[in-house]
Regions:
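SAM-dependent methyltransferase
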Residues: 121, 141-211
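A short glycine-rich, Lys/Arg-flanked "PGG" loop and its adjoining helix->strand segment in the class I
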Residues: 124-136
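C-terminal lobe and adjacent flexible extensions of AdoMet/dcAdoMet transferase-like proteins
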Residues: 205-245
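A short acidic, Gly/Pro-enriched loop at the edge of an enzyme's catalytic core
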Residues: 100-107
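Class I SAM-dependent methyltransferase SAM/SAH-binding core
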Residues: 53-98
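Conserved class I S-adenosyl-L-methionine
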Residues: 1-48
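Residues lining the SAM
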Residues: 111-113
Length: 245
């Protein structure tokens, strides 16, 4: 089902491919950036946190972290990894559209194309919830490659990639009337094939800024990379930094 595709997406070969992309080196580089954004020792909310790779690395560096994800498997994996590493953090199964906290966090992050999982009404539930969860002056970082200015210039009908022993083919269809990118992914390894459908709702930078501003989150900067290069048409990703007024 389109609205909840992500609940069952990260399984099997698909999950192995995601792990191959999310290397320890990438995680360290991303957390280097996040460490420069948030005050030392800040209480942070990572939503959705996936398998907790950023949540755990931030905790290792002294942040008080909480990770929330809709996947029970991811949360179980994250909690086990934290226990094994002796890292103190909190993980909860939950929906990013139904955050329960009020003025408890110094910062929050929505990393990795998650801002776009939903159509406008549900996306606004997340915005309202994360704004409520932040203290006044708290910061939000949104990152992903699906802002309109980033993804639309780069959409191809079909692409094939090889990652280690996995062949990954994507077939894209842009639904202009809905501003939605529909993608069929075919994942193949050792003769075994998995097919997944996924959808991302595409918002322009101006739309994202307005969505955040409607709940008191003022955009203070945008980047296209973790070395803070400016965001522009054709950039591979958007990193947006906002602050609660």
């Amino acid at each position: 089902m389109r609205t909840n595709w992500f609940e069952t997406f990260f399984q099997g070969i698909t999950l192995d491919l995601w792990r191959a992309f999310a290397t320890p080196e990438l995680t360290r580089m991303e957390v280097d950036f996040l460490e420069s954004v948030f005050p030392k020792g800040a209480r942070l909310l990572d939503t959705p946190c996936g398998n907790g790779r950023l949540t755990l690395e931030l905790a290792r560096r002294g942040f008080d972290t909480t990770g929330i994800d809709i996947s029970k498997e991811f949360i179980h994996e994250a909690a086990q990894e934290g226990q094994k590493a002796g890292v103190k953090t909190a993980f909860e199964v939950g929906d990013m559209r139904a955050l329960k906290w009020t003025e408890e966090f110094d910062g929050a992050l929505c990393w990795g194309n998650s801002f776009g999982y939903f159509e406008y009404p549900d996306m606004m539930k997340f915005v309202a919830g994360v704004a409520r969860a932040l203290k006044t002056g708290g910061r939000l970082v949104v990152q992903g490659g699906i802002a309109a200015e980033a993804i639309i210039p780069q959409i191809k009908e079909r692409e094939t990639y090889q990652v280690n022993d996995i062949t990954f083919t994507i077939e894209n269809r842009y639904l202009a009337a809905e501003s939605c990118l529909e993608t069929k992914g075919t994942f193949t390894r050792d003769g075994k094939e998995e097919v997944r459908m996924f959808w991302h709702h595409i918002y322009t930078l101006a739309e994202i800024r307005r969505m955040l501003a409607s709940h008191g989150l003022n955009t203070i900067d945008t980047f296209s990379s973790m070395d803070r290069a400016p965001f522009a048409l054709g950039s591979e990703q958007l990193i947006l930094l906002a602050q609660k007024l």
